[in-house]
Amino acid sequence: MSIKVIVAGFKGRMGSTAVEMVKGDDELTLAALLDPFAAEKEVDGVPVFTDKADLVGFDADVWVDFTIPAVAYENTHFALENGFAPVVGTTGFTEAQIQKLTDLSKDKSIGGLIAPNFAIGAILLMKFAAEASKYFPDLEIIELHHDKKKDAPSGTAVKTAELIREVRESKRQGAEDEMETLAGARGAEFDGFRIHSVRLPGLVAHQEVIFGAQGEGLTLRHDSYDRISFMSGVNLGIKEVVKRDQLVYGLEHLL
């Protein structure tokens, strides 16, 4: 049976790419599109909605969300309340929000996924970085994205940092008397190490984790040159959440 999918934020770069992915998979059916700024009533026979309240009672299985951080939590909560398994690529969630959504999914026995990054290579980078941090505890994260990205640091950088924190002995890096002569020069601090955000036109999504030790260094890097790189993960997420009974944070939990 085909999985019926709603795509929220379908007019954005990621949303429009997700629409094409769903349309190209015989196991998926594009059931509805949502965007508050949409002027059209339908696209290729698929109904378009501007208000999610109009989707109450709608016949669909999965809610794919590529909107903006300001509405992503509310959208995901709405999806769970109305029986749609959410697959969310929008970033900017707090730990408290993720916990509330996880608890709600358990109450509803509905699967779901919030993923800072859907590229398989990025997931591997996170895993490799966490493993390396056991042996190279001095590190810094540099994430680079297009200049239209609203949140910083990226969800991928935060997730990478969280995975590292789970296995790395906490320590404060740098000189004890370190002083910034220009505020923010050292980046954001997370568990004693630093995260840096770069925003430039022409970039898509890139991240490197740099490790340093006496006499040697190690650099791990992943590059997404095109948004199509995320679609294999989105596709996997859609097909997996309908089999599960609670929301997970991170695509690695479905691999």
UniProtKB/Swiss-Prot annotation:
Pathway: Amino-acid biosynthesis; L-lysine biosynthesis via DAP pathway; (S)-tetrahydrodipicolinate from L-aspartate: step 4/4. InterPro entries: DapB_C, DapB_N, DapB_N_CS, DHDPR_bac, NAD(P)-bd_dom_sf. The active site is at H145, K149. It comes from the Bacteria. Keywords: Amino-acid biosynthesis, Cytoplasm, Diaminopimelate biosynthesis, Lysine biosynthesis, NAD, NADP, Oxidoreductase. One of its GO terms (molecular function) is NAD binding. One of its GO terms (cellular component) is cytosol. Catalyzes the conversion of 4-hydroxy-tetrahydrodipicolinate (HTPA) to tetrahydrodipicolinate. (S)-2,3,4,5-tetrahydrodipicolinate binds at H146, G155, T156. It is found in: Cytoplasm. The gene is dapB. Its EC number is 1.17.1.8. Its main location: cytoplasm. NAD(+) binds at G9, F10, K11, G12, R13, M14, G89, T90, T91, A115, P116, N117, F118. It is an enzyme of class 1 (oxidoreductase). Belongs to the DapB family. One of its GO terms (biological process) is lysine biosynthetic process via diaminopimelate. Transmembrane segments: none annotated. This is 4-hydroxy-tetrahydrodipicolinate reductase. It comes from Streptococcus thermophilus (strain ATCC BAA-491 / LMD-9). It catalyses: (S)-2,3,4,5-tetrahydrodipicolinate + NAD(+) + H2O = (2S,4S)-4-hydroxy-2,3,4,5-tetrahydrodipicolinate + NADH + H(+); (S)-2,3,4,5-tetrahydrodipicolinate + NADP(+) + H2O = (2S,4S)-4-hydroxy-2,3,4,5-tetrahydrodipicolinate + NADPH + H(+).
